[in-house]
Regions:
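Short, low-complexity, Lys/Arg-enriched N-terminal segments of secretory-pathway carbohydrate enzymes
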Residues: 1-14
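Alpha-helical transmembrane segments of integral membrane proteins
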Residues: 3, 25-40, 377-705
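Start-transfer (signal-anchor) and selected internal transmembrane alpha helices
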Residues: 11-33
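Ser/Thr/Pro/Gly-rich low-complexity linker/stalk segments immediately outside membranes or between
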Residues: 41-61, 631-639
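Soluble extramembrane regions of membrane proteins in the secretory/endomembrane system
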Residues: 48-364, 765-766, 771-810
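Extracytosolic and intramembrane catalytic regions of membrane-associated proteins
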Residues: 92-129, 133-139, 175-176, 257-260, ...
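C-terminal domain-closing interface element
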Residues: 218, 222-240, 372-395
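Cytosolic-side membrane-insertion boundary helix
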Residues: 346-382, 397-407
Length: 864
């Protein structure tokens, strides 16, 4: 009976493939869907509110006012910790703006307290001790008179900037947003229960000293129960929520209910916490030293200007201020009235899985719920595939073994397609790296379509197309073979989803979404018998795949927008094209994995593969032309970090064994100095890796933990003319005493110098650092922290010398011979410090597509 039915069905709906010329239209349909839906929604921003509209739109964020303040901030120029601009002018500016808010505040409803915090302290920051002296924060507490809540909501951002950068996007944008949010709260009749603390952080770029000063020492910090951290890795656009918690899923519920323009994903959180993104934020300080749970949000658009002199007012749109302001204002009002704030610990259990859909709505659920969903849809997909295969045996003359065998072949082809879909883009990245052609997409990001996406799509479809073309005639209809390809992809995704779930990765939700819509399509096809009616099942599949296609193309477009600018500052050791290739490959697999095998519905599918290969070839030719040169002046710059260094090495007897000058390069991207060689004379440039075995810290004044981590990949360009350092860094031995027992000696020092200094310590053979006046964390964990030790020191408004002592133990107790090396670096990072004439000329000789973050530095090495 079943065979009779199928014979009639096949008679009415023969399995004839469609003409080949429809295949390009099929693929172009999905491309058109991306540009018609995803691209506009990704770039959608709200209409900004003007000051003269405030009376008709009470309680709304006014972007025009925030923009005016941002322009004033921009005109002030760089704000470097230790400079008068940051420590005096900016503090006065912030206090003036805060007083303007107080002047408009509803005095009958609210109280405002303002405090300028000056603090000194230290903590372990990655591989160094991060010390600070007299750094400043401007702190405001806004509270409702009728409330007696002792649970505060903390909102943090920073106004200091990187050397050479005005910092209008990072993070002046967030500072003015906070000021306008404060104004709207203070002038509104809509009160809030929990006091709100606005922390205008004056030392974030140090790194992360102002936040530590607040959370470890400020009088209000013990009452801060939740956090909204605001930062930026770009200038303008939509801010992304990329970290939450840890735990405390109630915060995600408030974001879902309050955020008018949601933009968030669990995947971003896991990528950031894995260290793939070369950045850090104050969120970690509040999390680790509070601990204060919260939400970490950052601007991400136009990361090309981040930490450069082109981070200016003119690249930030007013509507981007409106977007962030509306989200922040609504979120603050929601959390400011949250019942959970009374006892946050009672609501702390469980991580969240969270994401937005095209910025239209936000989804979150508990990690435990996510585990259940992932397992259910993973197993459900496998079960439905088994039902479909059984159904095929009922409508053909084949037994279950034959159908299972055919499906087994399809599954092997699926594994091959996955390997190719990942492998071909990665292979492209490797080839381009071998030819010194990395970052060709850096300015013209559309090049990734031909370089990485098309090869991935070819990999997805090639094994199946070859099999369908070359296989002998089979009793299994072609339409069933195509369904088996989708089934194989479903089973593969189900296995991956379950494995990632077991591994504790919440990003497994991506595979669950893909399975959800395929399971839906398969259910419809089974219940309606469309799977047995020629190719009609593919229409249901395409309709059900529209939603996941939109989501995955939106998500991975967002990741490319965020990550492509970061490839120019990921360092020299890792090929950045690998990251972009993997993102393109994973996005292609998830967005198109069920769709592109359907080109085999059309005749001559190998022509479609040839067309994709031709597109790849054309894009390759374009990429090796001038179009593929990564850098452009002002908009897509090459970052070159270098110091103008004067070095002096003292031996144990006080003699000088080395005194020289040169340029110390901490190169930021994979192309090294090659793009500069046409304009700059690099004769004598040496790789420092060879010096690292002979000299402590490779003999250079690496700035912070990132510079020190990359020191073996650094370059040194000797200079005949001595570098003129605009100041003096002095280390003075105050006293040397032998302690009781005779095997330990104490050395007491005084260090004087600029606002940024580093101390490097290396005990010699047979000597152990027993104690010191710094934090003991390094000494208490010798398995983690090994010599040479790095102590980073910065001061804000107090340049007083620091005094410290070192206690060293020696096996033979002989302290009349060399015991340890100590290196002292002084960094004059501010733009107000004068560069000598040769350095100025060197900077001017750099190509116009270069942004140089540079400053003079001294490095003195002593042996005691």
């Amino acid at each position: 009976m079943d065979n009779t039915i199928i014979e009639l069905i096949e008679k009415d709906h023969p399995k004839k493939q469609l003409p080949w010329y429809y295949a390009p239209s099929f693929l172009l349909l999905w491309v058109a869907l991306f540009f018609a839906v995803v691209f506009p929604l990704f770039n959608s921003l709200p209409t900004p509110v003007k000051i003269d509209e405030e009376t008709t739109k009470p309680g709304q964020f006014v972007a025009e006012r925030a923009q005016y303040i941002l322009l004033e901030l921009d005109r002030l120029g760089p704000k470097i910790v230790g400079d008068e601009m940051n420590e005096k002018t900016m503090v006065e500016f912030m206090l003036r703006e805060i007083e303007a808010v107080r002047g408009d505040m509803r005095q009958d409803l609210y109280d405002m307290e303002v405090d300028v915090q000056r603090a000194s302290g230290a903590y372990l920051h990655w591989e160094m001790i991060n010390m600070y002296q007299a750094v400043q924060n401007v702190v405001v507490k806004l509270s409702t008179k009728s409330s007696n809540s002792t649970s505060y909501l903390l909102i943090n951002s920073h106004y200091d900037t990187k050397p050479g950068s005005v910092g209008t996007g990072d993070a002046g944008f967030m500072v003015v947003t906070m000021l306008e949010v404060m104004r709207q709260l203070a002038t509104s009749e809509q009160t809030f229960e929990h006091p709100i603390v606005f922390l205008f952080n004056g030392a974030e770029e140090q790194p992360l000293q102002g936040s530590h000063a607040f959370i470890s020492q400020h009088k209000w910090s013990p009452n801060c129960k939740a956090l909204i951290n605001l930062d930026s890795a770009g200038a303008g656009g939509r801010e992304i929520l990329f970290q939450g918690g840890p735990n405390h899923p109630w915060l995600m519920r408030h974001y879902r209910d309050a955020a008018k323009h949601p933009f968030a994903t669990t995947m971003a959180e896991e990528v950031f916490q894995a260290g793939i993104i070369p950045s850090d934020t104050d969120f970690r300080i509040f999390r680790d030293f509070g601990p204060v749970p919260g939400l970490d949000m950052a601007g991400q658009y136009n990361g090309f200007v981040y930490h450069t002199k082109y981070d200016r007012f003119d690249v930030i749109s007013r509507d981007s201020l409106q977007n962030t302001g509306e989200n922040l204002l609504s979120l603050v009002r929601s959390i400011g009235n949250a019942e959970e704030m009374h006892d946050t610990k009672a609501h702390s259990e469980g991580h969240s899985v969270f994401f937005d859909f095209l910025g239209l709505f936000f989804v979150y659920y508990l990690e435990s719920t996510g585990i259940a969903l992932n397992i259910c849809f993973g197993l459900g997909g496998i079960i439905l595939v088994c039902v479909s295969l059984w159904r095929m045996t009922r409508t053909t003359e084949l037994d279950i073994g034959s159908v299972s065998g055919a499906f087994g072949i399809m599954f092997l082809l699926e594994l091959a397609s996955f390997v190719l879909a990942l492998g071909l883009p990665v292979l492209m990245a490797v080839f381009y790296d071998a030819g010194d052609r990395t970052l060709t997409y850096f300015t013209n990001s559309w090049l990734v379509i031909g370089l990485f996406i098309c090869p991935s799509v070819i990999g997805l479809v090639l094994p199946f197309t070859l099999y369908y073309t070359l296989r002998p005639s089979s009793k299994i209809p072609h339409t069933y073979h195509l369904q088996m390809a989708g089934h194989a992809h479903c089973v593969f995704l189900a296995i991956v989803c379950i494995i990632l779930t077991i591994a504790g990765l919440r990003s497994a939700y991506l595979f669950m979404i893909s399975l959800l819509f395929y399971v839906g399509a398969l259910t419809i096809n089974l219940l309606s018998s469309l799977q047995d009616r020629g190719y009609f099942w593919s229409l249901v599949l395409c309709a059900c795949q529209a939603m996941p296609f939109l989501y995955f193309s939106y998500l991975f477009h967002a990741f490319l927008v965020i990550c492509i600018p970061m490839t120019a500052r990921k360092g020299t050791e890792v090929n950045p094209d690998l990251l972009i290739a993997l993102l393109c490959a994973l996005g292609s697999i998830l967005a198109l994995g069920f769709l592109v095998p359907l080109i085999n519905i059309f005749r001559r599918p190998n022509c479609m593969i040839g067309g994709l290969a031709l597109i790849t070839f054309i894009f390759c030719m374009i990429s090796v032309s001038e179009v593929g040169f990564p850098y452009r002046p002002k908009t897509n710059v090459m970052r070159v970090n270098f110091l103008q260094v004067h070095r002096k090495f003292y031996e144990y007897d006080g003699s000088v064994s080395l005194e020289d000058s040169g340029y110390y390069f901490d190169l930021q991207d994979r192309r090294l100095e090659l793009p500069l060689r046409d304009k700059v004379d690099f004769d004598g440039l040496v790789h420092l890796e060879g010096e690292c075995d002979a000299q402590m810290m490779c003999g250079v004044p690496c700035f912070n933990h990132r510079w020190c981590e990359a020191r073996t990949a650094a370059r040194w360009l000797p200079r005949k003319e001595p570098v003129e350092v605009p100041g003096t860094t002095t280390l003075e031995l105050l006293n040397k005493t032998t302690l009781a027992g005779g095997y330990t000696a104490r050395y007491q020092f005084k260090l004087t110098g600029p606002a940024r200094m580093s101390i490097f310590l290396k005990p010699l053979s047979g000597v152990k650092m027993q104690d010191w006046s710094f934090l003991r964390g390094m000494l208490d964990n010798p398995g983690t922290y090994k010599p040479p030790y790095h102590i980073f020191f910065a001061w804000g408004v107090d340049s007083s010398p620091i005094e410290f002592h070192l206690d060293l133990t020696k096996v033979n107790g002989n302290f009349l011979e060399p015991v340890f090396e100590i290196g002292i670096s002084g960094h004059y990072i501010s733009h107000v410090h004068k560069r000598d004439a040769y350095s100025v000329q060197f900077i001017e000789d750099l190509p116009d597509f270069v942004h140089a973050m540079e400053w003079p530095a001294s490095y003195d090495r002593y042996i005691y």
